[in-house]
Amino acid sequence: MNIILFGPPGAGKGTQAKKMVDNYGIPQISTGDILRANVREGTELGLAAKEYMDKGELVPDEVLIGIIKNRLKEQDCEKGFILDGYPRTIPQADALAVILDEINKPIDVVLNLEVPDEELIERISGRLMCNCGASYHRTFNPPKKDDVCDICGGKVFQRADDKEEAVKNRLNVYKKQTEPLIDYYTKQGLLVTLDGTKDIDEVFEEIKAVLKKFA
């Protein structure tokens, strides 16, 4: 089954994608990851992408779609895939439709995790990190001692892009990019919207119910 996974920052997309990978044995394909892998491996498309990345510019769609096409042709995608973080625009969605047609792997379903902005802001702006790799949340999982890591005793901190203003900006960008795509895939009868405010396992049970018809 071939899946596109949508959801704003903080909606739990990564968590649900991991559960789908474990449950169905199909790979999660994150554009950021495969882009970095191609650059690291020095592939022709990776080198083309690196030229733009080194200048701090966005990688053009035609380079990105070539990298995605090559990844989807790999053996582990035979039974399906989860596309995470792509497409982000209507032109990208159109380009994706063309390559999926070429390799005969049409999208079965587009899962859209929906969470109200206020909850997303609380989820993300409450995150705390430590340099040792430990992570906390002011409300849901605070360190035992204020601002001190339970594991190494180091000072915990908030990442710059997790601050409330930055989160609001990220959500605005996401909405501008993704709302047209919600409409695009709704018209094709592919979109299923799920309530991302529910418990992680509850959300996954709903995903499994949706995917049952494609498994």
From Swiss-Prot:
Zn(2+) binds at residues 130, 132, 149, 152. AMP binds at residues 31, 36, 57-59, 85-88, 92, 159, 170. PROSITE patterns: ADENYLATE_KINASE (PS00113). It comes from the Archaea. ATP binds at residues 10-15, 127, 135-136, 198. Pathway: Purine metabolism; AMP biosynthesis via salvage pathway; AMP from ADP: step 1/1. InterPro entries: Adenyl_kin_sub, Adenylat/UMP-CMP_kin, Adenylat_kinase_CS, Adenylate_kinase_lid-dom, P-loop_NTPase. Keywords: ATP-binding, Cytoplasm, Kinase, Metal-binding, Nucleotide biosynthesis, Nucleotide-binding, Transferase, Zinc. GO terms for molecular function: adenylate kinase activity; ATP binding; zinc ion binding. It is found in: Cytoplasm. GO terms for cellular component: cytoplasm. Its EC number is 2.7.4.3. Residues 126-162 are annotated as: LID. Pfam families: ADK, ADK_lid. Residues 30-59 are annotated as: NMP. GO terms for biological process: AMP salvage. It catalyses: AMP + ATP = 2 ADP. Catalyzes the reversible transfer of the terminal phosphate group between ATP and AMP. Plays an important role in cellular energy homeostasis and in adenine nucleotide metabolism. Consists of three domains, a large central CORE domain and two small peripheral domains, NMPbind and LID, which undergo movements during catalysis. The LID domain closes over the site of phosphoryl transfer upon ATP binding. Assembling and dissambling the active center during each catalytic cycle provides an effective means to prevent ATP hydrolysis. Some bacteria have evolved a zinc-coordinating structure that stabilizes the LID domain. Belongs to the adenylate kinase family. Monomer. This is Adenylate kinase. The gene is adk.
